[in-house]
Each structure stands twice: as structure tokens, then as C-alpha cells.
Design a protein with these regions (language model features):
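A conserved beta-strand element that flanks and buttresses the S-adenosyl-L-methionine
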Residues: 107
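Class I (Rossmann-like) S-adenosyl-L-methionine-dependent methyltransferase catalytic domain
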Residues: 1-37, 50-85, 89-96, 138-239
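Short catalytic micro-motifs in class I SAM-dependent methyltransferases
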Residues: 110-111
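Conserved class I S-adenosyl-L-methionine
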Residues: 40-49
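A short glycine-rich, Lys/Arg-flanked "PGG" loop and its adjoining helix->strand segment in the class I
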Residues: 121-133
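Helix-capping/helix-break motifs at membrane-protein junctions
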Residues: 116-117
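Conserved acidic residues
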Residues: 41, 62, 104
């Protein structure tokens, strides 16, 4: 995961335009809010990235913890949200020192594809310790086997056409094709899981999970899973 962390900590071209970037984070925030069960919930966004719309999520809960591995991004988060008393910024390492059973909802969105299977197992172990007995883990934007970059391109173009940044999207795709992102994706690859494999992986980590009806974010060809502590009842899902 380290090379991907370095990439996202750099001046990258993953977003086609400011409008694309802003809408991306707004949609994710809206989807996360859909999983918040009560206004007194404590929410953890694991490897949150720039989290530009995090204030909206914080408005829907009692506390939002933004955990981010990239030091540059983490510094910007601290500066951006310093006035917001409901938002805390932490490194992933700091999560290991947090109180057990202190979190109602953990969201890991668009993270698993950048981790090795062993790294993801370790992350599941860390967050499982933090989740309250009735809490939930939401693992979003999981890439499926045999669904390649062409589908990601189609999802982006559909999103752009609907949201009014098609010209920027086309230019952005050209830039991405020549960028370090494409080189990293070709060299390192992205981890992919079938529905069955992700549910089994979560089960081995001590969770009972099911696939949500819709994915977090704009890409309907990817998957989101909702998990609870094994034996805590059926996992719920947002619409």
C-alpha cells in the first residue's frame, strides 16, 4: 500500500476537474450519512483521503474520526477541519491506541483495492476491536474480478455526462493514461474480490457480512459490503 499512499500524497491527476473532485466527495459523504444510525453515533472514516465534504458527515453524527495514512493529506485535513469540534484527524497507527468498542460505524471506502490481502486482514483486525457490539463496518467500492479499467472509464463518463463535466472527463482520461496512476495500476495491480470471497474474508476476520444493494459512490459496477460482529444479527444496508 505504501506506493499508493505516496501517489495520493503527491500532486496527482486522478480527478478530471475541481467539479469532478467536489462531486466525488459530496456523493461519498451523502452515502456515508445513509449508514449513520443515530445522531449520537461515533463514525470512523478509514483512509479517508481529502474528505472535502466531511463536515456534512460530522453534522449527522456526534463525532467523526478521519484516519488517513498519507502525511501530506493528513496535514491538510487537520488544517481544513481545525475549527470543527466534531472532527478528529488521526493516522492509521493511532487507531491501534484508541479505546476498544468505541466506534458505531467504520467506513472503508475505496481502500481494499490498494491493499494486499494481508494488509486488509490487518486493517479488519484493527477496526473490529474498535467497533461497538452493535456497530457496523461498511467496506465500499470493491472491484470485482474480470471487471477492468474499461468499466471504470464507462462509469466515469456516465457520471460526467450526468453532472456536466464531460469535456473535463475526456481530457482527464487522456492525462490519466499517461500518468503515474496508470503506471502504478499496471505494475502493482488492484486487488479484486468476488462477492463470495469478500464475505468469506470478512467472516475470517470475525464479521457477518452481506452485500449492500448499491455501491458507495458513482460506480455501480463495484460493490459495497455491510458487516457486523459475527453473532450480532443480520447486517443492515442503506438504500
Amino acid at each position: 500500500m505504501d506506493e499508493w499512499i505516496d501517489y495520493y500524497d503527491s500532486t496527482h491527476t486522478i480527478y478530471a476537474s475541481k467539479r469532478h473532485r467536489d462531486l466525488h466527495f459530496q456523493i461519498i459523504a451523502k452515502d456515508i450519512i445513509g449508514y449513520i444510525a443515530a445522531p449520537d453515533a461515533v463514525v470512523l472514516d478509514y483512509a479517508c483521503g481529502e474528505a472535502l465534504a466531511a463536515a456534512k458527515v460530522a453534522d449527522a453524527c456526534s463525532m467523526l474520526i478521519l484516519a488517513e495514512p498519507a502525511p501530506g493529506v493528513r496535514g491538510r485535513l487537520i488544517a481544513r477541519f481545525a475549527p470543527n469540534t466534531k472532527i478528529r484527524v488521526r493516522s492509521l497507527e493511532e487507531l491501534k491506541n484508541m479505546a476498544e468498542k468505541s466506534i458505531d460505524l467504520v467506513v472503508m471506502n475505496s481502500v481494499a483495492q490498494y491493499m494486499t490481502p494481508a494488509e486488509l486482514d490487518s486493517a479488519f483486525a484493527v477496526v473490529r476491536r474498535l467497533i461497538k457490539p452493535a456497530g457496523r463496518l461498511v467496506v465500499g467500492d470493491i472491484l470485482r474480478p474480470k471487471v477492468g479499467m474499461a468499466i471504470d472509464v464507462l462509469a466515469l463518463l456516465r457520471f460526467a455526462a450526468k453532472s456536466g463535466f464531460m469535456k473535463d472527463a475526456l481530457y482527464g482520461l487522456l492525462s490519466t493514461a499517461l500518468s503515474e496512476y496508470r503506471q502504478l495500476r499496471t505494475r502493482l495491480g488492484l486487488q479484486r474480490y468476488s462477492e463470495k470471497d469478500m464475505i468469506a474474508k470478512l467472516a475470517r476476520a470475525g464479521f457477518s457480512a452481506s452485500r449492500a444493494r448499491r455501491n458507495i459512490g458513482h460506480n455501480p459496477w463495484r460493490m459495497t459490503f455491510v458487516a457486523r460482529h459475527a453473532g450480532a444479527g443480520e447486517p443492515g444496508a442503506a438504500d
